Curated annotation (Swiss-Prot):
Coiled coil feature spans: none
Catalytic activity: 2-deoxy-alpha-D-ribose 1-phosphate = 2-deoxy-D-ribose 5-phosphate; alpha-D-ribose 1-phosphate = D-ribose 5-phosphate
Name the record gives this protein: Phosphopentomutase
Gene: deoB
Annotated residues for binding of Mn(2+) 1: D13, D339, H340
Presence of keyword Magnesium: no
Pfam family, one: Metalloenzyme
Binding site for Mn(2+) 2: D298, H303, H351
Gene3D superfamilies from the UniProt entry: Alkaline Phosphatase, subunit A, Phosphopentomutase
Function: Isomerase that catalyzes the conversion of deoxy-ribose 1-phosphate (dRib-1-P) and ribose 1-phosphate (Rib-1-P) to deoxy-ribose 5-phosphate (dRib-5-P) and ribose 5-phosphate (Rib-5-P), respectively.
Enzyme Commission number: 5.4.2.7
Lineage: Bacteria, Bacillati, Bacillota, Bacilli, Lactobacillales
BP terms from Gene Ontology: 2-deoxyribose 1-phosphate catabolic process; 5-phosphoribose 1-diphosphate biosynthetic process; metabolic compound salvage; nucleotide metabolic process
Organism: Streptococcus sanguinis (strain SK36)
Subcellular location: Cytoplasm
Length: 403
C-alpha cells in the first residue's frame, strides 16, 4: 500500500536556485553560466515576496548566500532541498526527462543562429514554398506572426523559427496554407530532424488566423515530438495501471508516453493551477500521480530577461499555493520544483545551468527539514518507490526521509 495515495508534482519552468557545479561548461551569449542564479538574482535585484513557498522552506535551502528577500523559517511546514542535473543539456525536455529518471548523455540540438540552409532548402523542395529567411531565429511566437504574417499572406512563404528549446516551429495562416498542408510539411520536417547535426525534440505546427495587426493563434497547434529513448517512471506507473495526469505541456514533452489522463495545454500559469485544482477535486482520481508544468516564468519573463515580470509571476503562483493545499487530501503529497534555470538578469536570452529547488509538503507529515542535496531523478525514484514500481535509469529515493 502506498505511503501517499496521490503525489502531485508541479514544475515551475526555469526557476533555478543557483549555478550548478558544471555551469561554466554552458554559456549565454559567450558568458559562462557560472554566475547565474535565477531565484537569487530576482530576490536581490527586485525583491521577492513568496510567503507560502517560504513557509515550506524555500529560504532554508542550502546556498552560498541566503535568498535576500525570502526569509528562513525556524519551523518550516515541509521538506526542502536543491537538486543537481547530471544530463548534458539545459533544455525543457532534458530537465523533465531526467526528473522522470533518464540520463541524457546526447543532448538535443538548439539553433541560436537559426537553422542551417540545408534544412530550409529541403523543406522548400518538399513543400514547393519558400521560407522567410529573416524569421529563421529564436523568436516569440506572437511577435513572429506580427512581423511576418502580412508577408506570408501576400506570398505564401513559410514562417520557420525556433526558441531556446530544441524545436522547429512553422507558423501558417490557415487561409493561406491549409491545415492539412501545414501538418504534412511538419511531418516532413520531423523526418529530417531525428539525428545530428539537427536532433530536435519537437516540430510544432503553429496555425493562426486574422488580419495584419490582429493575428491570433488557433487551437489547431500540433506537436511532432520524439518519445523518451527509455521507459520513464511515467511508463512504469502506466504499465502498473496507476493513474497519471498531465497538466500543461507535459504530454508534449513526453510525446504522450506513460500518460493516461491528459488535462490539456495551459493558457497561462493561473489556468494551469485551475486545471491542477480540478484534478485534485476529481473523485475518480483516488490514487496516482499528477504532473504539472507552468511555463510562463520561462516563456514570458526568463527569455525576455524581465526580472520584474518574473518576480510578479512567482508571487502570483505563490498566492495560489494555499488553494492547492486546501484541495489536497490527507494522504496526498505535493512536490514543487523546476527543470532548469533562466536567470532574467543574466547575459543572453538562453536557459542557465542551475540547481533546481525542491519543496515537499503533505498534510499527513509531522516532520520537516532538509533533505540531502541530490539529483533531478531522485524525484521520480521517490514516486516509484511510493507506488511500488521500478525506478527508471537513475535516481535515489528520499521517501524514507518523509515522516
Amino acid at each position: 500500500m502506498p505511503k501517499f495515495n496521490r503525489i502531485h508534482l508541479v514544475v515551475m519552468d526555469s526557476v533555478g536556485i543557483g549555478a550548478a557545479p558544471d555551469a561554466n561548461n554552458f554559456v549565454n551569449a559567450g558568458v559562462p553560466d557560472g554566475a547565474s542564479d535565477t531565484l537569487g538574482h530576482i530576490s536581490k535585484t527586485v525583491g521577492l515576496n513568496v510567503p507560502n513557498m517560504a513557509k515550506i522552506g524555500l529560504g532554508n535551502i542550502e546556498r552560498p548566500a541566503p535568498l535576500k528577500t525570502v526569509p528562513q523559517e525556524e519551523n518550516p511546514s515541509g521538506y526542502y532541498t536543491k537538486l543537481e542535473e547530471v544530463s548534458l543539456g539545459k533544455d525543457t525536455m532534458t530537465g523533465h526527462w531526467e526528473i522522470m529518471g533518464l540520463n541524457i548523455t546526447e543532448p538535443f540540438d538548439t539553433f541560436w543562429n537559426g537553422f542551417p540552409e540545408e534544412i530550409l532548402t529541403q523543406i522548400e523542395e518538399f513543400s514547393g514554398r519558400k521560407v522567410i529567411r529573416e524569421a529563421n531565429k529564436p523568436y516569440s511566437g506572437t511577435a513572429v506572426i506580427d512581423d511576418f504574417g502580412p508577408r506570408q499572406m501576400e506570398t505564401g512563404e513559410l514562417i520557420i523559427y525556433t526558441s531556446a528549446d530544441p524545436v522547429l516551429q512553422i507558423a501558417a495562416h490557415e487561409e493561406v496554407i491549409p491545415l492539412e498542408e501545414l501538418y504534412r510539411i511538419c511531418e516532413f520536417a520531423r523526418s529530417i530532424t531525428l539525428e545530428r547535426p539537427a536532433l530536435l525534440g519537437r516540430i510544432i505546427a503553429r496555425p493562426y488566423v486574422g488580419e495584419p495587426g490582429n493575428f491570433t493563434r488557433t487551437a489547431n497547434r500540433h506537436d511532432y515530438a520524439v518519445s523518451p529513448f527509455n521507459p520513464t517512471v511515467l511508463d512504469k506507473l502506466n504499465e502498473a495501471g496507476i493513474a497519471t495526469y498531465s497538466v500543461g505541456k507535459i504530454n508534449d514533452i513526453f510525446n504522450g508516453a506513460g500518460i493516461n489522463h491528459d488535462m490539456g495545454h495551459n493558457k497561462s500559469n493561473n489556468h494551469g493551477v485551475d486545471t491542477l485544482v480540478k484534478a485534485l477535486k476529481d473523485d475518480n482520481f483516488k490514487e496516482g500521480f499528477s504532473f504539472t508544468n507552468l511555463v510562463d516564468f520561462d516563456a514570458l519573463y526568463g527569455h525576455r530577461r524581465d526580472p520584474h515580470g518574473y518576480r510578479d509571476c512567482l508571487e502570483e503562483f505563490d498566492a495560489r499555493i494555499p488553494e492547492i493545499i486546501k484541495n489536497m487530501r490527507e494522504d496526498d503529497l505535493l512536490m514543487i520544483t523546476a527543470d532548469h534555470g533562466n536567470d532574467p538578469t543574466y547575459a543572453g536570452t538562453d536557459h542557465t545551468r542551475e540547481y533546481i529547488p525542491l519543496l515537499v509538503f503533505g498534510k499527513s507529515l509531522s516532520g520537516q527539514g532538509h533533505i540531502p542535496v541530490g539529483h533531478f531523478a531522485d524525484i521520480s525514484a521517490t514516486i516509484a518507490e511510493n507506488f511500488g514500481v521500478d525506478k527508471a535509469m537513475i535516481g535515489e529515493s528520499f521517501l524514507d526521509k518523509l515522516v
